[in-house]
Amino acid sequence: MYHVIIIEDDPMVASINKQYVEVTPEFRVDRIFKNGSEALPYLKTNPTDLIILDYYTPVMNGGEFLDALHNAGLTPSVIMVTSANDTDIVRSLLNRGITDYLVKPFEYTRFKTALDRFTETKKYLEHSHGGLGQHDIDRLFSVNDQRADAKPSLAKGLNETTLAMIREYLQNNRN
């Protein structure tokens, strides 16, 4: 079971996020906090796997919270769920190591994708013993990039059936 906290100052949004998290039985929301300042003491004594974090919270914003988290030596994964969409803010948060970033409003399916990515990465790292090779690291990064699993697109006017027929023809007519 993954232990989750939510840092969100809007009670309605916090409640929705909690419901979204708990749809998946692997996750349990242990606490909801209105700001990062309230959450830090809790995090120092309670192991937490994942934080759902809003950027715009009172007392300290999401970036300040991530700095405080790092300074305390705490390393839970963080999914931003926020209305903050300014390029500088997004860049700053990415540089602080967030796991995913959802801009409000969003669909449940996007939230679920973020949780699935977290779970997949966490499980992969838990089952990897020793050092990771380049292939392993590529797999970790492809978890966060759906394009890595996508098939290359075919040229316009070419589909899988036609391509298979061409391959078969070439194989049968090798000289």
Where are these regions (language model features)?
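Conserved acidic carboxylate
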Residues: 8
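Acidic, metal-coordinating helix/loop segments flanking the phosphotransfer/catalytic sites
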Residues: 32-50
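Acidic catalytic/metal-coordinating carboxylates
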Residues: 35, 61-64
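Short amphipathic alpha-helix used as the core "switch/output" element in two-component signaling
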Residues: 63-74
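C-terminal output helix
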Residues: 106-115, 130-136
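C-terminal output/effector regions of signal-responsive regulators
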Residues: 135-175
